[in-house]
């Protein structure tokens, strides 16, 4: 047996596939990381572009509105309950989906001290009532044709849902409606009901 020196060229060739695999893996990891960072940044910018809701953390403006069923409803009479106000219009396409989701919330959490009110901003109360009836709404519908309550709650998009805690403080606002925003809304609602 003779002593052989390792061939440097052969040694490099044997190492190249490992280096290439590592390099390809590193590139893939960096690409995925940059993609996730980009997505996070895009979501953050989208939320940053949304104007802040000035009433968050402040007392909810009191109001009295006429309900479609005939009675008057005053918000301050619901202290001690978690109140959901959903601003909607019969001309809003995503309002129907949101009202159905709120119906499910009421069915699930009514016994925990939850009151849900739909605040219709339609100019025509009859049209608002027909829309709510066709949507199968099971909670009280309040009529705000002059939009005074909508203005006091700074409603700038429909649908818009406002969560008010048992002390009468605005705690969460959901602008528009999507599966993702609905998930966050339900988390916020559960938190308030457990306080």
Where are these regions (language model features)?
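N-terminal secretory signal peptides that target proteins for export/translocation
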Residues: 1-26
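Hydrophobic beta-strand core positions in alpha/beta domains
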Residues: 84-86, 118, 162-163
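Short active-site neighborhood of thiol/selenol oxidoreductases, capturing the structured segment around
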Residues: 76-93
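Structural microenvironment flanking redox-active thiols in thiol-disulfide oxidoreductases
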Residues: 96-135, 145-152
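Bacterial N-terminal signal peptides
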Residues: 26-44
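N-terminal "domain-start" segment that seeds a small globular fold
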Residues: 47-75
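Thiol/disulfide oxidoreductase modules built on the thioredoxin-like
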Residues: 130-137, 145-190
